[in-house]
C-alpha cells in the first residue's frame, strides 16, 4: 500500500495539472480537455437559453469529461509521487558540509575549510571517521569503511580504498572508520546524488523512442476519429431529412462520441507506465541514465555475464599447492605467499593464509629485502614481487608460459598436465615461477552459486543467450560453463576481446547487455546497448555505462532485463486493451445512436441499451472509470513470465485483447441498467 500522503499529494497535483501548458504535453488527453471545455460552454449557453442543447444532459457529459481528465492526471501524479517520495529521502543525504581541502597532498595539516558546494573538480579533500564525504570522488590515498545506506539502503558498511576497482566514493555517504584522501570528480549539481534525485523525480525524464512512436500512432488515430466525428453533424442532418425520421446528432453527443472512440485509456496511462518503470528500477537500487536504457533492457537478447560474483560465489579460495618434479610443496608455498603479500584480492589473501596454515610461513621484513611488488594488470595477467635479485611471478598459465619463454626459460610439459587437471575439475590454476623456473600450480577453487542453472534456463526460454566472461583458461571456463548451464563462454578475456565480442553480436543484429566495474571495462560498457556499471567501480566505468547498480551486484543484470521486458509488456498490453475497448465501444454505441434515423440498426443493438442518451452516458462513464481501475496495473506492471516471446504474445492477446473487447459490453450494459433503475435516463 502506498502512503496516505502520496495519495493526498496526487489529488492536489491532478488539479494543478489542469493547466493548459501541462495538458498540451499529452495530445490525446488534450482532445478530452478541449471537449470538456466545449461541453461546459454548451451547458452555460443552454442554461441561458442561447443554445438548444439539453442543459442537464450536457452538464453530465461535461462533468464526466472533466473527471476523465482528472483521472488521467491522477495516474501520472501517483507515479510521480512515488518517485518524489524516494527523492525526498535522498535529499536528506544531500546537505552542504564543510570540507577539508588540502593545499598539498603530502601535508594533511595544511587545510582550508570550504563548503562542499564550492568544491571544484580535481580539488583534494581529507575526510576523517564519522564525517560525511562532501562530494563524489576517487580515493587517492587510504582505506576506510563507508556507510552508503543513505543511497543504497544497505546498512552494512563497504570498503573504499585507493587503487583497484573500489576507489569511487559518493557525496552524502559517511566514513565509519579511518581516513581517506579524495580527489573530487564532480561539482555541485552534477554529482551522482544530484543525478539520482533528478531521475527519480522525473525532472530529467525524456520520452523514449518507443513512447514517441506510440504517441504518434495514438495522435493519428485521434485525428482520424476527430475527422469522422466532425462529419457526423452534416451527415446526420442530411440523412434525417432524406429518411424523414430522427434528427441530427447534437454537438454534445459528437464530443462524447469522439472521446469514447479516441484511445483515451492508453493515452491517460502512457506517461505513468514510463515513470513507474523507472521507479521499479530505482526500487531495485539501479539508477538508469535514460528511459531508452530501460527499453533496451527489455529488448536484450544477449547477456554477457562475469563469472566471478555472478555465476560463482566470487571469492575463489586457494585449496592446494601442486609442485612440479624437483620442487617441494613448501618451496612452492613460500614463493606463492611472497607473490601474494601485496595482493588485496580475496584470492591473494587466501594464498597467504593457506601457506601459513600448511607450513607456518609468517611475515618477512620487506624493507630489509628491498622488495618491490608488481601489481596484477589485465594486460600482463600476472602479479608478483622482485627482491634481492629474485623475481617471482604468478598468473594464468598462458601468460606465465609467454613470460618464461620470452626470458629464455623452459616451460615444463608436466605443468601443462597439472593445469589441465585443475581446469578440468572446474578450478582456476595459477602458475608460479621464480627466476624463470616454474615451481608449480596454485589450485583456486570456484563454487557455482545455487540456483543459477535454473535462472539461465528461464533466460533461454525467454530467447536470451547467456555468455560467461572469464579470465580463466578455456578448460576451466568450459567446466564452469557446463556446470552453470550458460550457452557460451569467452575464456582468457581481455578488454579488447570483450569489446570485439559485443561488436560481433551487434553486427548480427543482437542487443547486448553487460556489467563492469573497472576502468578496463569502460570501452566494452560504452559499446554495449545496456551497460550496468557497479557503484563500487571506477568513475570511468560509471561514465561509460548507462545504468549504475547501487548494490554492486553483477546478478542484478538479470533483474534489469526482467524489469525492462515488464515495462514493454505493460505498455503493449494496455495499448492492446485500449484499442480493443475502442472497437467494442464503437459497436456498442453507433447502432443505438443512429437507429432513430435508420431503424434497421436497432437489430444491432445486441446489448439492448435503453436509449441513445443512456448509451452515450454509459459509454463515457465506463471510459472514465476504466482509467482508475487500470492505474494499479500501470504502476505495478503486467506480471512477467519466463516463456518464449510467441507464447507470451498469444497469452497477452487473449487476456488483454479479448478482455478489452468483452469488458466494455458487460460494463456499459451494467451502467445502462443502473442509470435506468435510478431514473436518470
From Swiss-Prot:
Keyword Ribosomal protein applies: no
Arranged from A to Z, the UniProt key words for this protein are: ATP-binding, Cell membrane, Ion transport, Magnesium, Membrane, Metal-binding, Nucleotide-binding, Phosphoprotein, Potassium, Potassium transport, Translocase, Transmembrane, Transmembrane helix, Transport
Summarize where ATP binds, as residue positions.
343, 347, 376-383, 394
Q: Which Pfam families match?
A: E1-E2_ATPase, Hydrolase
Q: Which positions are tagged coiled coil?
A: none
Membrane topology, as annotated: Multi-pass membrane protein
Q: Where in the cell is it found?
A: Cell membrane
Say which family it is in.
Answer: Belongs to the cation transport ATPase (P-type) (TC 3.A.3) family. Type IA subfamily.
Name listed for the protein in its UniProt record = Potassium-transporting ATPase ATP-binding subunit
Its taxonomic placement starts with: Bacteria, Bacillati, Bacillota, Bacilli, Bacillales
Amino acid at each position: 500500500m502506498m502512503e496516505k500522503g502520496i495519495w493526498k499529494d496526487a489529488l492536489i497535483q491532478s488539479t494543478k495539472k489542469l493547466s493548459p501548458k501541462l495538458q498540451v504535453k499529452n495530445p490525446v488527453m488534450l482532445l478530452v480537455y478541449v471537449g470538456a471545455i466545449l461541453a461546459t460552454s454548451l451547458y452555460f449557453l443552454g442554461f441561458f437559453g442561447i443554445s438548444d442543447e439539453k442543459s442537464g444532459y450536457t452538464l453530465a457529459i461535461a462533468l464526466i469529461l472533466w473527471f476523465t481528465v482528472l483521472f488521467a492526471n491522477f495516474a501520472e501524479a501517483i507515479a510521480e509521487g512515488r518517485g518524489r517520495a524516494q527523492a525526498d529521502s535522498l535529499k536528506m543525504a544531500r546537505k552542504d558540509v564543510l570540507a577539508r581541502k588540502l593545499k598539498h597532498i603530502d601535508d594533511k595539516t595544511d587545510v582550508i575549510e570550504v563548503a562542499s558546494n564550492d568544491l571544484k573538480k580535481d580539488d583534494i579533500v581529507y575526510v576523517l571517521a564519522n564525517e560525511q564525504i562532501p562530494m563524489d570522488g576517487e580515493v587517492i590515498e587510504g582505506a576506510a569503511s563507508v556507510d552508503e545506506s543513505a543511497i543504497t539502503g544497505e546498512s552494512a558498511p563497504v570498503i573504499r580504498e585507493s587503487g583497484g576497482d573500489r576507489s569511487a566514493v559518493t557525496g552524502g555517504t559517511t566514513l565509519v572508520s579511518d581516513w581517506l584522501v579524495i580527489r573530487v570528480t564532480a561539482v555541485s549539481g552534477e554529482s551522482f546524488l544530484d543525478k539520482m534525485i533528478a531521475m527519480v523525480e522525473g525532472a530529467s525524464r525524456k520520452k523514449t523512442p518507443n513512447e514517441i512512436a506510440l504517441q504518434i500512432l495514438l495522435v493519428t488515430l485521434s485525428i482520424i476519429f476527430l475527422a469522422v466525428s466532425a462529419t457526423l453533424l452534416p451527415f446526420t442532418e442530411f440523412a434525417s431529412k432524406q429518411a424523414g425520421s430522427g434528427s441530427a446528432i447534437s454537438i454534445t453527443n459528437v464530443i462524447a462520441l469522439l472521446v469514447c472512440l479516441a484511445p483515451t485509456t492508453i493515452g491517460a496511462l502512457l506517461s505513468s507506465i514510463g515513470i513507474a518503470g523507472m521507479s521499479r528500477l530505482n526500487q531495485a537500487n539501479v539508477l538508469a541514465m535514460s528511459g531508452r536504457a530501460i527499453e533496451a533492457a527489455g529488448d536484450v537478447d544477449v547477456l554477457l555475464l562475469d563469472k566471478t560474483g555472478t555465476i560463482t560465489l566470487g571469492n575463489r579460495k586457494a585449496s592446494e599447492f601442486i609442485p612440479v618434479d624437483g620442487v617441494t610443496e613448501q618451496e612452492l608455498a613460500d614463493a606463492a605467499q611472497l607473490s601474494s603479500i601485496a595482493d588485496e584480492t580475496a584470492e591473494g589473501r587466501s594464498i597467504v593464509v593457506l601457506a601459513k596454515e600448511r607450513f607456518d610461513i609468517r611475515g618477512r621484513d620487506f624493507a630489509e629485502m628491498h622488495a618491490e611488488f608488481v601489481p596484477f594488470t589485465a594486460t600482463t595477467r600476472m602479479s608478483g614481487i622482485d627482491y634481492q635479485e629474485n623475481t617471482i611471478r604468478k598468473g594464468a598459465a598462458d601468460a606465465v608460459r609467454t613470460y618464461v619463454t620470452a626470458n629464455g626459460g623452459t616451460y615444463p610439459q608436466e605443468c601443462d598436465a597439472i593445469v589441465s587437471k585443475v581446469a578440468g575439475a572446474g578450478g582456476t590454476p595459477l602458475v608460479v615461477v621464480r627466476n624463470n623456473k616454474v615451481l608449480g600450480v596454485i589450485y583456486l577453487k570456484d563454487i557455482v552459486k545455487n540456483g543459477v542453472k535454473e535462472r539461465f534456463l528461464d533466460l533461454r526460454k525467454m530467447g536470451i543467450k547467456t555468455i560467461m566472461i572469464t579470465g580463466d583458461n578455456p578448460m576451466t571456463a568450459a567446466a564452469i560453463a557446463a556446470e552453470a548451464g550458460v550457452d557460451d563462454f569467452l575464456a582468457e578475456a581481455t578488454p579488447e576481446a570483450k569489446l570485439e565480442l559485443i561488436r560481433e553480436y551487434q553486427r548480427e543484429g543482437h542487443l547486448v547487455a553487460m556489467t563492469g566495474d573497472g576502468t578496463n571495462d569502460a570501452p566494452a560498457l560504452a559499446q554495449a546497448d545496456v551497460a550496468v556499471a557497479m557503484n563500487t567501480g571506477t568513475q570511468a566505468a560509471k561514465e561509460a555505462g548507462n545504468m549504475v547498480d547501487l548494490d554492486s551486484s553483477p546478478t542484478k543484470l538479470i533483474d534489469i532485463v526482467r524489469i525492462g521486458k515488464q515495462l514493454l509488456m505493460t505498455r503493449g498490453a494496455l495499448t492492446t486493451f485500449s484499442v480493443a475497448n475502442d472497437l467494442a465501444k464503437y459497436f456498442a454505441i453507433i447502432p443505438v445512436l443512429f437507429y432513430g434515423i435508420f431503424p434497421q440498426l436497432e437489430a444491432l443493438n445486441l446489448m439492448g441499451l435503453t436509449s441513445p442518451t443512456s448509451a452515450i452516458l454509459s459509454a463515457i462513464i465506463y471510459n472514465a472509470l476504466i482509467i482508475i481501475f487500470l492505474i494499479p496495473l500501470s504502476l505495478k506492471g503486467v506480471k512477467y513470465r519466463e516463456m518464449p516471446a510467441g507464447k507470451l504474445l498469444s497469452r497477452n492477446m487473449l487476456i488483454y485483447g479479448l478482455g478489452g473487447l468483452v469488458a466494455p459490453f458487460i460494463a456499459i450494459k451494467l451502467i445502462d441498467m443502473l442509470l435506468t433503475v435510478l431514473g436518470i435516463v
